[in-house]
Amino acid sequence: MRINPGEITKVLEEKIKSFEEKIDLEDTGKVIQVGDGIARVYGLNKVMVSELVEFVETGVKGVAFNLEEDNVGIIVLGEYKDIKEGHTVRRLKRIIEVPVGEELLGRVVNPLGEPLDGKGPINAKNFRPIEIKAPGVIYRKPVDTPLQTGIKAIDSMIPIGRGQRELIIGDRQTGKTAIAIDTIINQKGQGVYCIYVAIGQKKSAIARIIDKLRQYGALEYTTVVVASASDPATLQYIAPYAGCAMGEYFAYSGRDALVVYDDLSKHAVAYRQLSLLMRRPPGREAYPGDIFYLHSRLLERAVRLNDKLGGGSLTALPIVETQANDISAYIPTNVISITDGQIYLEPGLFYAGQRPAINVGLSVSRVGGAAQIKAMKQVAGMLRIELAQYRELETFAQFATELDPATRAQIVRGQRLMELLKQEQYSPMPVEEQVVVIFAGVRGYLDDLPVEAVRRFEKEFLRFMHEKHQDILDDIREKKELTPETEEKLKKAIEEFKAVFRV
């Protein structure tokens, strides 16, 4: 058998021509230092700020946080203990996205959207980046629809509208979370989807909250995002942004959403920790210079969209914890200046048995008044004035021995109104019930009752209204105002009930 050298050459040439090596170019870097939830990486020259990266050997994700001359500071989203010096890091060329949509309702997830409740995987069809630019003025419309909390003191005097940002502020153990949870429970049947973001809390406390939401049937329209105290600071830092993205999905599809951030003090501490580890220069209270921007870019995403964009809304209820009533500290003043009002809870009132312990004098709602229903406006205007006068006279009355009848009458009414504003936890009240009860208080129908009988009067009066005068309640709910005819009927109903009420 003869071998033809020409044929061999031809075959080799064809093989060489058809050979095509696919060169896969990837921007990678090497870990030069790792610890405390951050990694320093050499290389990754083209990486962008906030870009997602992957540690190839472990599969853990990270985010480019600091871009320096000779290295990149990366915050690790998850367990960093398996990452070693020399490991490879590659760019993913996208920013963090979280799953969003109806599939997350009723679920407990971490800030990356991974389930924590043992109910199996979440098959979400939609994803959203956790950081987006807040919509501009042109894309918004004024807040005009109420978000009923079911809490008498708030819905009457510090009303919240859909698309508003209302801060809940106070010392530890004064009932801040209780107000937020009651508000979520009260959204049942209101078409509002809720996101509860727990930042830096004990797992036992979070488990208790989830259990209460389930018990009152609120979990079916709520997503709980958890970055507990035992989670890395990196997850606590991204948690509120992830929760906001989940809420935005509903807002941008023409629906209403409510996001509770519990709480932003711990969020600021987590961000301070990351910034100090990254050697960013510390400022006041050792917080970095951009701590204001951290919260403003989050809370500016609360929005009431105009009709062209579907008219949806995202309402934010951030919570901030104060130390010894100091609302002039750094983080509280920052968040007060960003939000549209604050609900201030006071330990003194809490321990005196006034619960919810809302200081009505220091609390304010800057845009919610426009969203309040007319019926509530009609009765609540009087309530705020009566209580303001009562607060002034109360201190004076402690020292004065003899009071004129007018002053005594104002103090008597003020005491009964304060008693009327007390409310049990987990028992939000429909707005029509609030209107009739407050009407009875401000029109003086409780003045001749002993203070200790006010709560019982309220309970029995509402039962009486449902049994005998349901039409009045229906009328207020449907018309959203107290017409002269309804007012007359209500006065007669109160007098009818007072005739049979036994003190």
From Swiss-Prot:
InterPro entries: ATP_synth_asu-like_sf, ATP_synth_asu_C, ATP_synth_asu_C_sf, ATP_synth_F1_a_nt-bd_dom, ATP_synth_F1_asu, ATPase_a/bsu_AS, ATPase_F1/V1/A1_a/bsu_N, ATPase_F1/V1/A1_a/bsu_N_sf. It catalyses: ATP + H2O + 4 H(+)(in) = ADP + phosphate + 5 H(+)(out). GO terms for cellular component: plasma membrane; proton-transporting ATP synthase complex. The record marks S363 as: Required for activity. It holds the Pfam family ATP-synt_ab_N. It is a peripheral membrane protein. ATP binds at G170, D171, R172, Q173, T174, G175, K176, T177. GO terms for molecular function: ADP binding; ATP binding; proton-transporting ATP synthase activity, rotational mechanism. Keywords: ATP synthesis, ATP-binding, Cell inner membrane, Cell membrane, CF(1), Hydrogen ion transport, Ion transport, Membrane, Nucleotide-binding, Translocase, Transport. Its EC number is 7.1.2.2. It is found in: Cell inner membrane. SUPFAM superfamilies: C-terminal domain of alpha and beta subunits of F1 ATP synthase (SSF47917), N-terminal domain of alpha and beta subunits of F1 ATP synthase (SSF50615), P-loop containing nucleoside triphosphate hydrolases (SSF52540). Produces ATP from ADP in the presence of a proton gradient across the membrane. The alpha chain is a regulatory subunit. Belongs to the ATPase alpha/beta chains family. F-type ATPases have 2 components, CF(1) - the catalytic core - and CF(0) - the membrane proton channel. CF(1) has five subunits: alpha(3), beta(3), gamma(1), delta(1), epsilon(1). CF(0) has three main subunits: a(1), b(2) and c(9-12). The alpha and beta chains form an alternating ring which encloses part of the gamma chain. CF(1) is attached to CF(0) by a central stalk formed by the gamma and epsilon chains, while a peripheral stalk is formed by the delta and b chains. This is ATP synthase subunit alpha. It comes from Thermotoga neapolitana (strain ATCC 49049 / DSM 4359 / NBRC 107923 / NS-E).
